[in-house]
């Protein structure tokens, strides 16, 4: 999801990607022990988006692991499109203004909050499909014998220091009781709350968008599925789950959205209020 990447932000993302590609070419990288830390890697992918498949597969091939490259260790998970029917216990495709605003309390709405709070917003078809896609990936993870899994959307690229920083994070910095690790996220302007933790990690409490690059433990996936349905967009709902998840985040994205391809998502809150 490219929430927030429009105009100048998209141009900056493209420039940053070029910068990272240049530095990666200059300095190279060392193989990482990926399967030691993350046993399964899933990519939520619309099969007709062959442009994204080729771009991300090329990116993954640059990440060297002790088994080859990261491209050799991923599962391309088919995304849904234009879903009209799904189990009632999985997703509620409407949410209130207050449900979103509590995560990102934009002061622009203060004078009208009483009249806006209970207004209902319908999710876009894409938001529903994405939410259901993440649920299905979590379930497939739990059907495996893996203890840790990474989940990607198909429009991302890797920071040129990814290998160095991810090694430090998994070997030295993550506490034993972690549940979810964001390797890329978009902090919102008004609700982002966190504490410092270590050189490459912060402890996250609230206020991030994107579900395009994150890592879950098995117990975290179980907790998320136990707390279904997802209400509204998954990257809004997940913030409410931090109450029982030990959430961490890299303060500078190690994996970020490219801004290079057109988004297949429509953002219901943005369409309704901005």
Task: Name these PLM-found stretches.
Residues 3-152, 156-274:
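An acidic/histidine-cluster motif and surrounding catalytic segment
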């Amino acid at each position: 999801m490219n929430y927030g990447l429009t105009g100048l932000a998209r141009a900056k993302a493209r420039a940053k990607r070029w910068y990272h590609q240049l530095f990666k070419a200059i300095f190279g990288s060392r193989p990482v022990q990926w399967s030691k830390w993350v046993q399964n890697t899933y990519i939520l992918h619309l099969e007709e988006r062959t442009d994204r498949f080729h771009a991300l597969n090329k990116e993954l091939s640059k990440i060297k692991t002790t088994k080859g490259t990261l491209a050799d260790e991923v599962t391309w998970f088919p995304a849904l499109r234009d879903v009209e029917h799904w189990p009632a216990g999985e997703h509620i495709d409407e949410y209130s203004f207050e449900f979103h605003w509590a995560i990102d309390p934009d002061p622009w709405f203060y004078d009208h909050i009483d009249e806006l709070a209970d207004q209902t917003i319908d999710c876009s078809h894409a938001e529903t499909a994405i939410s259901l896609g993440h649920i299905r990936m979590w379930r497939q993870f739990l059907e495996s014998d893996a203890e840790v899994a990474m989940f990607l959307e198909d429009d991302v690229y890797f920071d040129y220091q990814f290998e160095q920083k991810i090694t430090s994070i998994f070997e030295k910095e993550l506490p034993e009781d972690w549940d979810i690790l964001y390797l890329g996220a978009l902090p919102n302007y008004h609700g982002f709350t966190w504490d410092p933790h270590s050189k490459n990690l912060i402890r996250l409490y609230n206020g991030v968008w994107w579900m395009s690059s994150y890592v879950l433990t098995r117990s975290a996936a179980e907790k998320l599925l136990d707390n279904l349905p997802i209400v509204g967009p998954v990257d809004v709902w997940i913030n409410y789950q931090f109450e029982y998840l030990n959430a961490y985040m890299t303060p500078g994205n190690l994996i970020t959205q490219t801004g290079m391809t057109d988004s297949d998502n429509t953002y219901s809150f943005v369409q309704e209020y901005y």
